[in-house]
Regions:
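Gly/Ser/Thr-rich phosphate-binding loops and adjoining beta-strand/alpha-helix segments
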Residues: 2-6, 21-53, 68-86, 99, ...
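Helical lid/core segments from catalytic subdomains that handle acyl or acyl-like groups
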Residues: 92-149
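Plant-skewed but cross-kingdom recognition/interaction modules and surfaces
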Residues: 119-131, 135, 165, 169, ...
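Flexible helix-coil linker/hinge segments at domain or subdomain boundaries
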Residues: 208-218
Length: 218
């Protein structure tokens, strides 16, 4: 998995990064209700599961934007991953804990969901935090799910994570409202590399995908 270092001296975003990383360290979050009214019947007709399909949709939009693939390597250099893969949580009902797995991102939805099913079968019953540890040099971003609550806002406190630049997502329980089905999705980003413009573009792209999702069929 490639990691392309930026030329920090000529990077147009350098003053913004230095302000929000060094002078005023700043993470911020935004929670948006994604309208999945059209998505759900398409999923039912396709035979695909909801959770891996939404993980794929989020991953597609993250990989579409270099600003959402930015990270710092072990030397502190800033760069952009050629591809980032999603980690996601699997809940264990027996002891009420969870494990973190990952599945390699690929553009094809059905192929991704097949890989997700295989990873879930292989690692999903391992009761430890990282049931599938990351590979060396791998770019990973986080998705978690809280299917027991439909929240309006969610923010994570990350006091020691100022060098972590990749986005973090949390899914809530979807709900019916005024005839629509809405999925709360919280997105937390580092302001050093991600502005409101990038967050807005992500959600607009994700909504367009949820409205059409042509790869699922009619």
């Amino acid at each position: 998995m490639g990691f392309q270092k930026i030329d920090y001296a000529t990077w147009p975003r350098r003053p913004y990064f230095e302000h929000y990383h060094r002078d005023v360290p700043c993470w911020y979050s935004m929670t948006v209700d994604v309208d999945i009214t059209a998505l759900l019947p398409r999923l039912r007709g396709s035979g695909l599961r909801f959770y891996p399909s939404v993980i794929h949709g989020i991953s597609r939009m993250v990989n579409a934007d270099p600003a959402l693939r930015m990270a710092m390597d072990e030397t502190g250099a800033i760069g952009v991953y050629d591809r980032v893969d999603p980690t996601y949580t699997i809940f264990h009902k027996d002891d009420e804990t969870f494990s973190v797995l990952w599945t390699a991102y690929q553009p094809d939805l059905r192929a991704f969901c097949q890989d997700w099913e295989a990873d879930r079968a292989r690692y999903g019953d391992i009761h430890t935090f990282e049931a599938r540890p990351p590979e060396a040099g791998q770019g990973l971003f986080n998705i978690s799910a809280v299917p027991w609550a439909s929240f309006r806002s969610l923010h994570l406190e990350l006091p020691e994570a100022n060098d972590y630049l990749l986005p973090i997502f949390t899914l809530g329980r979807y709900r019916k409202e005024n005839g629509r089905t809405l999925l709360p999705l919280a997105m937390q980003v580092h302001h050093g590399v991600t502005d409101g413009f990038h967050v807005g573009r992500f959600f607009n792209r994700l909504q367009a995908w949820a409205d059409s999702a042509p790869e699922m069929g009619a």
